[in-house]
Amino acid sequence: MRIWVDADACPGAIKEILFRAAQRTGVELTLVANHPIRVPPSPVIRSVQVAAGFDVADHEIVRRVAAGDLVITGDIPLAAEVIEAGAQALNPRGERYTPETIRERLNMRDFMDTLRASGVDTGGSAALSQRDRQAFANELDRILARRPSQG
């Protein structure tokens, strides 16, 4: 298992949780972004910078992800693509996307896009709370505990 992070919009607190988890478990962690990302010196943590542009980081993650990998993203279309490829997807608030829930999330996203396009103010996401950070850390730990042994 490898962990891939859609790092352009990933909150710093979530990156810190991921850095600690990668160091503790030895699971490879790669942050993909269209700008430089600082990562701690580690044999299991690295960053990949892609060209600027719409969804370039997403496309790079889809190109590299393998079945069984974990992708951290709040981007619902990216989550749908990696699930289709056999990977797992987890958002920064600790919600694990599944084949059963991703279609509903895509439909809601499309509906909200339609509302915004028609001029309706749909508001934005709430700031990441301590509860969100804890939910993320807990779900990440569950996923890492269930990964196949590396021996």
UniProtKB/Swiss-Prot annotation:
<protein>
    <recommendedName>
        <fullName>UPF0178 protein Hhal_1913</fullName>
    </recommendedName>
</protein>
<dbReference type="InterPro" id="IPR003791">
    <property type="entry name" value="UPF0178"/>
</dbReference>
<comment type="similarity">
    <text>Belongs to the UPF0178 family.</text>
</comment>
<dbReference type="Pfam" id="PF02639">
    <property type="entry name" value="DUF188"/>
</dbReference>
